[in-house]
Amino acid sequence: MKHGFIKVAAATPRVTVADCKANGEEILKAIHEMEKEHVKLMVFPEFCITGYTCHDLFLQRCLLDSAWDELLHIADETKETDALIFVGLPLRHRGKLYNVAAALNHGRIVGFVPKTHIPNYNEFYEQRQFAGAEEEDVEFVDFLKGVKNEEDEFWDEIPFGTDLIFECEEFPEFTVAAELCEDLWVPAPPSIRHAINGAHIIVNLSASDEMVGKDSYRRTLVSGQSARLICGYIYASAGEGESTQDLVFGGQNMIAENGSMLAESRRFENGIIYSEIDVQRLADERRRMSTYPAVSTCSHTRVGFSVEEEETELTRTYPQYPFVPSVKEERDERCEEILNIQAMGLKKRMEHIHSKSAVVGLSGGLDSTLALLVMVRAFDRMGMPREQIHCVTMPCFGTTDRTYQNACKLSCCLGAKLTEVNIKEAVNIHFRDIGHDDSVHDVTYE
């Protein structure tokens, strides 16, 4: 957690449809595995306690009771787990049934986030069982009445609502909000509100089925949302074990940060992916972007959670040359773009001043070579002859035969005029004028 890095994970455990006890054991197994990696934010799929494909079994009291009991069991078993954990289950509230993400921390249920957008098109018919959440004030509800006694730490009322931001007490920039599956696919996802109200990480508990080509679209959604909101985005989806009666789930898990995909699972394999999200960098980037809205302190409810601060061992990698793509095709495309941008700028300037020629100092090194290539492209776009480009090479003490020959060949191949002005004697005269010994290669010499 130090220096802004938060160790995070997205997990897809094997699920047994409608067997909450078995699913709870798989969830706990995954939690203990993530504990070994010192993960501070753990995200599981939508309906991971029951399975997504329970269909009308969701309307059965026995399944709902079993899911609730298993949530309490998972909470009780994770009292010593130093992390914020998100799991999915069905939850009864005010006579309706909701698809919720439950947030757990040190054995406590710290919040319920209901799904806002309930799909009822194509292969989805969730409205048959579930109600969509309203964007309204967060309620504090005594869900545990009659389940725990008054001396038990569970006795606190639990916040229920879409507009919850979970804020780490030890590290205020570690702020998390949740949305569920379809919420990301709509024109205005809840994560927009969450981000502009201070959430640096969005978690998505999902059960997204597989269709040909859907994985790339899903990836674009996740990376694009993380870029647009300048946030970390953790996407955990259902996988093997769900019913394949009419759908197949591939368990495509992703962790993205500000448009970059930090980690992605192999589809059709259950498991866990890990990475580190730099929330301090995200906060800095938001401050730099003058059009990013100021954080509102009144529209969302802040819910505190606690994790210990410790060193984070980095598994994510940073490129040695961040501005130079390692893939040749991408590198060629980037170089082409650089040339076009600079050539367009030069073309506009030359047309504005009605210039018919240009002069460039050509040493044979990288900088002057790029300048000449840009100039050639600008002249070609203006339909002007390259002979009007005047290259001047000025060999001196530091000029090697290689760079000198490069300058000569480059101008010749590109059809530009070349003039050589040897400046050795002029520099020696200047050294004598200022009283500097030309054998002393210090700052003055350079």
Residue ranges of model-derived segments:
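ATP-dependent adenylate-handling ligase core
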Residues: 384, 394-446
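Catalytic nucleophile loop
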Residues: 368
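Enzyme catalytic cores with a strong preference for nitrogen-chemistry domains
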Residues: 1-361, 372-373, 377-388, 402, ...
